[in-house]
């Protein structure tokens, strides 16, 4: 997918540039490891998370909706969704033609809906940024190198 909105923005430009169009960016949802996949077989995929150029814009609210929809269909009684974030939702294409807090408002309303209306537990890890302003259960790490240890520690604490 492309930067700066991709085909979604191109379509908007070709069709009259409607005022306050909402999200103006293509989405890419990546599954590094499905819940049914063996961890050893997916190890190489997890390394792709750090591949330069793979990740584009941060449309966090829609990513959460997608992930919560997938996890809600799982048969397990306890559902935990761990969010790894580099700060706030940012998509220049969308923010350039909507209110500056458009994506942030959507993220907050999505989190509220998941926390209040579902049986999904949300945990957030902010890398270099405090995401506690969005998530009720959040921690901050300063370097991506800390991620593995923190994730293990946080997951372990859920079962204490």
Describe the role of every protein-language-model region.
Residues 1-160:
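Acidic, glycine-rich A-domain
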